[in-house]
């Protein structure tokens, strides 16, 4: 019984404390406490607030209000609900506390979800104030309270205590380096901030967000090995070397790398890595841990191109299309050659202009009937369609141009008549994706067309030669599907390491109207290069008439892809550069081209040709002699003037400078050894010839040596004398002293005679 009374007292204390922190009830507290029940039949209690967020003034005001209410209840003759409801009686039962605890858990979950929805931007911060939730008792409990006349207690609610927290949603976890930068390369950490600052201090061209991962000691293989360090970052592979003030910096973007291979130095030592880009090849040797460096380079490379697959032997890569690209092959990836070389898209040279002028002179020697025999457009079907491919091309090898068909004539080639005057016209077509030029050329439309696509391919072939193209093959014009087509093929040299590449061009005349406009589409493909089968370059040429019978030339191009490739960016960049260079050369060629003046030409016989030829030879011969002599003298002066600059340029090469320094050191060493071996004594060099003649009685030592000997002997005699006196032995070393004294007397006598002779001869 005592235990039950103690537990009842504990419950009464808990109820009093709970009633002290209750929030405002729904009608006024005084009215509800006086009546004992709610007028509306339901008693509502609000979720009380956390005392941590309540001000002291509010707590004190609530305490005073509750004390006032208690006094008012006492005056009304009512007892406290806690006194009227001892343990086991009334409406306060243990089941109520259990039900209220479950309901409190549900309320806490609802409150937590609500707080998460309102704090999505910063989920780690706890809401400063919880949203109150209102709960009501059921109608049955209210009916029981009204019937018994007792006041039902509010349900026990769980609230956010001072140590509670709201669960934040899951966040993405990333591994960060020591300097706080999130690493995008999985499994590798960035270098510390000091090394990163030193890295950007050396390579100032790199963006600051390109962080250093690691660096390794190695040597760049060139004419000599340049020892330095390789720096690996997220987007670049860099190398720095400083030898005797010669600084070498290399920055290789990872996006331009074609292959990464393991190599051996001197075919024996497996400590080198070869990195090949679109335009260059770099060999780094002398790695202490070659495999570790190689794996990191491959990881960075794959991080930039996630769909790359390294082959099993570690040589070359394979792209998503399955094409294997080997870094050791001689294929060219130079987009300059794959995009900028078209069948009608090369520049000219002075040699081409000279040969064109010679062709015009030969045309002037034809008959008048041949002058008027020009057709507008040759619509004849090509001959020899069943012949081999070699019979339908014009081959240029070296300086010779050969037509491969047997009869020596190419009647299927296209040509248009020369129109010298025409009003302006407008090109109604649309350009391709990238416009290269829209300029006016000081030539007629017919002239420009004949130079590019005419039957006489001398100009275009010479132009190809000026661009250093080889194995030029220009096919015949063939009419296919009412459109003229021509095949062009040549080999273009490119930058190392690939040396050259083959280009295949198809020229198609889409619209041919000399009185309106001409439209030519040239399609270039380079299947031999990596990803060469995945794209073609199309170039559109539009010729229309401008003012003063000139030509309005519109050139545009586009790169069309049939497959996806990881070299798309570099290839399109190279295509843009190659096309821009080509257009510049082409416009220069048209400006340098000169049309021979047309006029009434006389019929020239064979006798007239021979006579004119002989006169021209006799008149030009002296000029050639004079010009040759002038050229020789001018060339000699030019060489003499440029010789110092040539030497300086030659010495600027590190290898040459090192050889010169080593040779100079060898010469200096040889001279120094000669000076040591054949050195002359000071007194000997000062002697005159006359004194040598007078020295008939030669003394076996010079003056300086004699003085040194005298001094040493006197010291020795002095020491011996002291020793003799101290030891009282007069016979000790007596013989040696006597010999020295005799020699000194003879020496003194000879010196006196020599002095006398010099005085007699007048030297003293």
Swiss-Prot record:
Source species of the chain: Schizosaccharomyces pombe (strain 972 / ATCC 24843)
UniProt-listed Pfam families: GRAM, VASt
- Would you identify the family this protein belongs to, as annotated? Belongs to the YSP2 family.
Question: What are the residue boundaries of the GRAM domain, all occurrences included?
Answer: 197-264
Q: What is its main location?
A: membrane
- Subcellular location as annotated: Membrane
Compositional bias annotation for Basic and acidic residues: 118-145
TM regions (residue ranges)? 647-667
Which parts of the sequence carry Phosphoserine? Answer: 80
> Which residue spans belong to the Lumenal compartment?
1-646
Where is there biased composition of kind Polar residues?
Answer: 25-41, 61-82, 158-173, 331-340, 389-399
Which sites does the entry annotate for glycosylation?
A: 23, 118, 240, 330, 364, 376, 442, 554, 627
Q: Which residues lie on this side of the membrane: Cytoplasmic?
A: 668-764
Q: Which InterPro entries match?
A: Cholesterol_transport, GRAM, PH-like_dom_sf, VASt
Cellular compartments per GO CC:
cortical endoplasmic reticulum; endoplasmic reticulum membrane; endoplasmic reticulum-plasma membrane contact site; mitochondrion; nucleus-vacuole junction; perinuclear endoplasmic reticulum membrane; plasma membrane
Question: Which SMART domains has this protein been placed in?
Answer: GRAM (SM00568)
Name used for this protein in its record: Uncharacterized membrane protein C20F10.07
Question: Would I find Transmembrane helix among this entry's keywords?
Answer: yes
């Amino acid at each position: 019984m005592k235990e039950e009374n103690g537990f009842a007292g504990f419950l009464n204390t808990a109820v009093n404390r709970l009633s002290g922190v209750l929030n405002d009830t729904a009608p006024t507290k005084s009215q509800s406490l006086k009546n004992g029940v709610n007028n509306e039949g339901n008693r509502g209690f609000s979720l009380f607030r956390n005392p941590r967020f309540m001000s002291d003034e509010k707590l004190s005001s609530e305490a005073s209000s509750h004390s006032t209410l208690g006094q008012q209840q006492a005056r009304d003759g009512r007892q406290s609900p806690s006194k009227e409801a001892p343990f086991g009686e009334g409406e306060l039962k243990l089941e109520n506390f259990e039900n209220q605890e479950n309901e409190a858990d549900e309320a806490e979950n609802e409150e937590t979800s609500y707080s998460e929805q309102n704090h999505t931007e910063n989920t780690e911060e706890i809401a400063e104030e919880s949203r109150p939730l209102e709960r009501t008792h059921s109608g049955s409990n209210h009916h029981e309270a009204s019937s018994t006349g007792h006041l039902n207690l509010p349900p026990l609610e769980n609230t956010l205590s001072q140590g509670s927290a709201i669960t934040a949603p899951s966040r993405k976890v990333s591994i960060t380096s020591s300097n706080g930068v999130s690493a995008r390369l999985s499994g590798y950490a960035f270098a510390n901030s000091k090394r990163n600052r030193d890295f950007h201090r050396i390579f100032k061209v790199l963006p600051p967000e390109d962080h250093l991962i690691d660096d390794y000691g190695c040597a760049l293989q060139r004419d000599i090995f340049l020892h330095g360090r390789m720096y690996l970052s997220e987007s670049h592979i860099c190398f720095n070397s400083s030898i005797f003030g010669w600084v070498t910096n290399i920055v290789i973007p990872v996006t331009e790398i074609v292959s990464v291979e393991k190599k051996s130095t001197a075919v024996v030592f497996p400590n080198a890595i070869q990195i090949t880009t679109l335009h260059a090849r770099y060999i780094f040797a002398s790695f202490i841990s070659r495999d570790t460096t190689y794996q990191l380079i491959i990881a960075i490379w794959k991080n930039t191109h996630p769909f790359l697959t390294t082959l099993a032997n570690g040589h070359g890569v394979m792209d998503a299309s399955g094409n294997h690209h080997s870094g050791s092959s001689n294929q060219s990836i130079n987009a300059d050659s794959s995009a900028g070389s078209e069948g009608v898209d090369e520049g000219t040279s002075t040699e081409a202009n000279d040969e064109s002028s010679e062709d015009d002179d030969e045309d002037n020697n034809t008959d008048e009937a041949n002058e008027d025999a020009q057709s507008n457009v040759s619509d004849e079907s090509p001959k020899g369609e069943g012949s081999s491919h070699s019979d339908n091309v014009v081959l240029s090898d070296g300086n010779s141009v050969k037509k491969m068909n047997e009869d020596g004539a190419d009647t299927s080639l296209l040509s248009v008549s020369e129109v010298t005057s025409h009003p302006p016209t407008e090109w109604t077509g649309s350009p391709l994706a990238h416009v290269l030029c829209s300029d006016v050329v000081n030539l007629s439309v017919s002239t420009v067309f004949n130079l590019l696509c005419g039957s006489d391919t001398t100009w275009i072939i010479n132009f190809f030669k000026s661009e250093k193209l080889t194995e030029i093959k220009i096919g015949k014009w063939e009419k296919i599907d009412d459109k003229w087509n021509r095949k062009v093929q040549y080999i273009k040299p490119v930058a190392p390491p690939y040396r050259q590449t083959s280009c295949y061009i198809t020229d198609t005349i889409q619209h041919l109207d000399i009185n309106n406009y001409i439209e030519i589409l040239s399609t270039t493909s380079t299947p031999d290069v990596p990803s060469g089968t995945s794209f073609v370059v199309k170039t559109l040429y539009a010729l229309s008439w401008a003012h003063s019978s000139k030509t309005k030339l519109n050139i545009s191009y586009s790169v069309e892809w049939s497959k996806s490739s990881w070299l798309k960016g570099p290839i399109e960049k190279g295509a843009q550069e190659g096309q821009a260079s080509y257009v510049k050369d082409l416009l220069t060629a048209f400006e340098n081209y000169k049309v021979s003046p047309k006029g009434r030409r006389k019929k020239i016989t064979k006798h007239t040709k021979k006579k004119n030829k002989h006169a021209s030879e006799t008149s030009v011969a002296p000029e050639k002699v004079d010009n040759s002599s002038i050229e020789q003298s001018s060339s000699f002066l030019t060489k003499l003037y440029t010789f110092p600059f040539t030497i300086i340029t030659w010495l600027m090469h590190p290898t040459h400078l090192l050889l010169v320094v080593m040779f100079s050191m060898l010469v200096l060493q040889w001279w120094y050894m000669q000076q040591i071996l054949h050195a002359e004594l000071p007194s000997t060099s000062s002697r005159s010839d006359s004194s040598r003649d007078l020295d008939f009685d030669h003394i076996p030592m010079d003056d300086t040596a004699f003085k040194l000997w005298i001094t040493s002997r006197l010291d020795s005699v002095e020491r011996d004398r002291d020793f003799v006196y101290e030891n009282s032995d007069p016979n000790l070393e007596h013989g040696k002293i006597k010999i020295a004294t005799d020699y000194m007397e003879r020496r003194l006598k000879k010196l006196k005679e020599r002095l006398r002779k010099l005085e007699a001869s007048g030297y003293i």
